[in-house]
Amino acid sequence: TQEGTEKAIAAFKEHCSEQQVVCRRIMHEQKNPFAAMISEARYNDLTIFGLRSIFDYGFTSDPDKAIIKLMTLGVRPILAVADNYRPIKKVLIAYSGSMESAKAIRHFLHLNPWPEVTLHVVHFKEGQEREPFLLKDAAEFCEAHGFEVKTEMVEGQARSNLLPFARENNADLIVMGNSVNKALLQRLMGDTVLETIKSADLPLFLSQ
């Protein structure tokens, strides 16, 4: 309802003020909300939207392409929040070893939205051997930014194993990254990120 929306906005603005975070309300009366989101993203550090609303409430006729469009046009990082609030204490970082995946870690560490969290960096592999220093380097980078971190190598596909692994390890947030190349992003989003968004009951931090 409109009343509920106004209360939520007021509470959000009050919380931002308490944390000394700049917050302003912008209203756009137009049929294409994505045009407004893309425009405003140029001058903001983080974009937040409901994890399921983009799929469940007719926000767009093609959610898959909409999320791809947001990320390829520069709306990132994105925090996709779940329906139910949960304190963020344990963060699971899905790390592929790619430059894009490393950038996602860097964006999260630099933004530092939850300073007291512990980090769990996981790499999913499908039989191939990875460099032994892959997770070691990622862990050292996180530790250099003052975070407590542990690492784990898991056999299997990220698409089918990421969410079960996150739940088993009591993660409160998942950090993921993808390439900005549109063709590659469409393939990767279809394989992992979109599948995760559609199925997740955890908030997601999505970055380049």
Where are these regions (language model features)?
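Acidic, proline/glycine-rich short linear motifs
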Residues: T1-E3, L119-E143
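Structural beta-alpha unit
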Residues: E3-T47, A144-I174, S179-L188, L194, ...
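A generic secondary-structure signal
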Residues: E14-H15, A80, H107-L111, F141, ...
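Intrinsically disordered or low-complexity boundary/linker segments at protein termini
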Residues: M37-E40, D45-P115, H120-V122, S199-Q208
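Short, small-residue-enriched loops and turns at beta-alpha junctions
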Residues: F55-Y57, E126-E131, K182-A183
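Charged helix-capping and loop-helix junction motifs
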Residues: D62-A66, L134, L188-V193
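A general structural motif
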Residues: M99-R106, E129-L134, Q157
